[in-house]
From Swiss-Prot:
Keywords: Apoplast, Cell wall, Cell wall biogenesis/degradation, Disulfide bond, Glycoprotein, Glycosidase, Hydrolase, Secreted, Signal, Transferase. Residues 1-24 form the signal peptide. PANTHER family: XYLOGLUCAN ENDOTRANSGLUCOSYLASE/HYDROLASE PROTEIN 8-RELATED (PTHR31062). The gene is XTH16. This is Probable xyloglucan endotransglucosylase/hydrolase protein 16. The keyword Nucleotidyltransferase does not apply. It comes from Arabidopsis thaliana. It catalyses: breaks a beta-(1->4) bond in the backbone of a xyloglucan and transfers the xyloglucanyl segment on to O-4 of the non-reducing terminal glucose residue of an acceptor, which can be a xyloglucan or an oligosaccharide of xyloglucan. Contains at least one intrachain disulfide bond essential for its enzymatic activity.
Length: 291
């Protein structure tokens, strides 16, 4: 079950908010392969990881450490060719029915058709905050960096250091925000052909299996939590304890322009614009969705 830190521990963590610890090491040291038997592999001296999916099973891994606020970077190269029906998920999550979660999900497609990048935020077990995007490149040709920046003020989703989505803390409007539960990093490759591609109309072509996604370049500048206490490396204090100034650096004028560019040309779904879904009015956090 996901732990909710007591008030004393939480206040201690917030005092050192974002005095981060950077981990840019071996997948062997930082992650456990959790399911899929031989379908998950760590190789190249711990610098590379792959997940595979076949008709029998997918595969997945999770971090050994738990994090509470920080920036998580991972380079991925997604399943090439006909990836319809497959989902590559990369996300932060706590455990239990009132869990918090911050999601990247890459929904596969038929050969020559674009992946859909699905994002979502869960707080206290409630999600339904989806935004979806096409990418401005082919994510199967090369590695690209997908980042989650998690702060008490907001969550930023980034692709190759370009912000694509900002989820602001709207607790003053009664909207829960992920800030109390430490989360681990998870990733999995699995079959979801009942919904992933065109709402389930396109099924997985098992003649193309195994499907494989590749990972490298993991980095975490974050606070880790263990047994109710936190560890943050002081050498990152200057970049993570500056509060609003650091937030401004992440979303400076150029970053805001890039965010608007992505949302204008590549966003294909936004729950904050779905009148059919919310005929009585949009969720309250949608009022704070613009940057």
């Amino acid at each position: 079950m996901g732990r909710i830190l007591n008030r004393t521990v939480l206040m201690t963590l917030l005092v050192v908010t974002m005095a981060g610890t950077a981990f840019s090491g071996s997948f062997n040291e930082e992650f456990d392969l959790t399911w899929g038997e031989h379908r998950g592999k760590i190789f190249s001296g711990g610098k590379m990881l792959s997940l595979s999916l076949d008709r029998v099973s997918g595969s997945g891994f999770k971090s050994k450490k738990e994090y509470l606020f920080g920036r998580i970077d991972m380079q991925l190269k997604l399943v090439a060719g006909n990836s319809a029906g497959t989902v590559t998920a990369y996300y932060l999550s706590s455990e239990g029915p009132t869990h918090d979660e911050i999601d990247f999900e890459f929904l596969g497609n038929e050969t020559g058709k674009p992946y859909v990048l699905h994002t979502n935020v869960f707080a206290q077990g409630k999600g339904n905050r989806e935004q979806q995007f096409y990418l401005w490149f082919d994510p199967t040709k090369n590695f690209h960096t997908y980042s989650l920046v998690w702060r008490p003020q907001h969550i930023i989703f980034m692709v190759d250091n370009v912000p694509i989505r900002v989820f602001n803390n709207a607790e003053q409007l009664g909207v829960p925000f992920p800030k109390n539960q430490p989360m681990k990093i998870y990733s999995s490759l699995w079959n979801a052909d009942d919904w992933a591609t065109r709402g389930g109309l396109v099924k997985t072509d098992w003649s193309k299996a195994p499907f494989t996604a590749y990972y490298r370049g993991f980095n975490a500048a974050a606070c880790t939590v263990s047994s109710g206490s936190s560890f943050c490396d002081p050498k990152f204090k200057s970049s993570f304890t500056n509060g609003e100034s650091q937030v401004a650096n992440e979303l400076n004028a150029y970053g805001r322009r890039r965010l608007r560019w992505v949302q204008k040309y590549f966003m294909i779904y936004d729950y904050c614009s779905d009148l059919k879904r919310f005929p009585q009015g949009f969720p309250p956090e949608c009022r704070k969705s613009r940057v």
